[in-house]
Amino acid sequence: MQQDEDLFTHQDTLANLHENLPLTDKLEFLHQVIREDFPFIDRVAIALFDEKTEMLKTYTHSTEGNDSPITTYEAPLSSAPSLRTIIEHRRPRLVQNLDIFSHGKHEHTKRVAAKGYKSSYTMPLYQSGTFIGFLFFNSLEEHPFAPQILRQIDIYGHLIALMVINELTAI
């Protein structure tokens, strides 16, 4: 008969997510787990949409080196046409080279460029079909997001979305 110790040899990699921790701490933990497989993901950030004011607001982030370009920022969604396009398509946006936005006039575009980010994968967040915000995976590298990598990042993205929804419904 198998010993009890033999039955409990695996430690759940994501067990910390069950703990009573603030969302920012959970996001930072999960970001480190993601970086074990995808070390090029330098920043994970969440911006929430306030339907009443039509504003997009920074909610939380995890940034390697803790030097986020956008920590407390809000802007009308109408001032971000490329983000509005994501909502219209109801699909993530992949930008393998952020230089396409190098002539952007918006503050958030300038801040991201100033920190040296080269690529971005942006997922729209939905709760029961209603748009609630965006999840950004940023990298200091160009072209790091291969299709097989995106499949795995999507899983993390949906996990983060559920964490955000859980946090919002608890408030």
Q: Where in this protein do the model-derived segments appear?
A:
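Signal-transmission linkers at sensory-effector interfaces
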Residues: 1-25, 166-171
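Regulatory loop-to-helix N-cap segments in sensory/regulatory domains
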Residues: 2, 138-155, 163-171
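Short, hydrophobic-rich beta-strand element in sensory/regulatory alpha-beta domains
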Residues: 29-35, 41-50, 56, 83
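GAF sensory/regulatory domain recognition
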Residues: 45-71
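Regulatory sensory and allosteric helical modules in signal-transduction proteins
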Residues: 67-103
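Signal-transducing coupling segments at domain and membrane junctions
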Residues: 96-119, 139
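A short, aliphatic-rich beta-strand micro-motif
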Residues: 118-126
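Short hydrophobic/glycine-rich mini-motifs in sensory/regulatory modules
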Residues: 125-135
